Amino acid sequence: MTIRDATLSDSAEIAALTTQLGYPTETDAITGRLAKIAGQREQLVLVAVLENTVAGWLQAHACEVIESGFRAEILGLVVGQSCRRQGVGRRLVARAEQWAIEIGAETLVVRSNTKRVESHSFYPALGFQASKTQAVYRKRLEADPNQFLRQRPIGDLGR
């Protein structure tokens, strides 16, 4: 098994895995998202490759949080159904943890949907501790997702 940075050529397999997880996604959408975050130091997108096939992917990002400091967070982790229980997820998380340490993150956070029962034993087995239960609220916005790229640099608070 090889763990490596995702590339645009992985888009179709990442889309298929994402759809398998229950989030139907088109290849073009994944390609566009990967292109937007390519080269951003605070973003990490990895794939696990088994026998020339993407068996899983992980996305993490790092940010400074006012109340809790600099942290990394796993935003998504998907392992194909046929590749589960083979160490794919464990290896992806280990690489994300290594990255988080390298960039100086104080903690690595992951959120897990309550309906993903398997993950509730997976993360504690890797040393994660449940820290809270929360409700997540979402509001769909009518916005141009490319607008962010045209905004002032992050960190410029109008000084």
PLM region spans:
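Acetyl-CoA-dependent GNAT
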Residues: 5-70, 75, 80, 156-157
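Conserved GNAT acetyl-CoA-binding A-motif
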Residues: 93, 100-112
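Conserved acetyl-CoA-binding loop-helix of GNAT-fold acetyltransferases
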Residues: 79, 85-98, 125
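Conserved N-terminal entry element of GNAT/NAT acetyltransferase domains
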Residues: 1-9, 143-159
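Conserved active-site alpha-helix within GNAT-family acetyltransferase domains
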Residues: 90, 102, 114-133, 139
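Conserved amphipathic alpha-helical interaction elements at protein-protein interfaces in regulatory
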Residues: 20, 85, 98-102, 129
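Short coil/turn motifs at secondary-structure junctions
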Residues: 62-65, 79-82, 115-117, 142-144
